[in-house]
Amino acid sequence: HDSYDGYRYWKHNIKNVDKDFVVFKGIEYDTLDAGHIIVIMPENLKLRLMELRGMPVQLLIPIVHNYGGILGPAHPFGEKFMSFMNSKAYKRNPDILSEFDFIEVFNACESKMANDKALEMAEKYNLTGTAGSDSHKTESIGYAYTVIPDEIRKESQLIEYIKHRNKTECGGKIYENTSRGKLGKA
């Protein structure tokens, strides 16, 4: 969270190994009042502000959009304190959903029910769906996928694709080895 360290590692250690494997630079931003929000900025932009956690979502949205980026809630129906649908910001202003560009509709570390609700929400608001592994361990990398056209190779191309509300194919496999999976839901 709040770090591009995974992207930096790929860029410096793995990027030249497989030219056909495309990695987009993004961040899961931990807001003050709206849980985790995925942010993707244009490839040539270095905005260190994204690595400082705790900004309110009503400040994050215009910053991201003014710099040409896109954003959407990660695991919106997941654990209470990390998920948008349980947040103070959503409860104060449900219409804030219309300010997002996409919604994570499949998260490999969330339940089928949580993912199904996220998909329904994306359809209701006509937002592009994405998927993520939410990997915090190397063993859970690759449990989710989002299919996009092959010609999209840069963040700016992905941003335009999503801004035009293009639909994607998303899915994956639920990763059962999370702490919640071992201990049960809180």
Model-found features: residue ranges?
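Divalent metal-dependent hydrolysis catalytic cores, especially in the metallo-beta-lactamase
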Residues: 1-5, 70-72
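Caspase-like (clan CD) cysteine peptidase catalytic core
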Residues: 52-54
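Phosphate-binding/switch loop-helix module in NTP-utilizing enzymes
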Residues: 56, 60
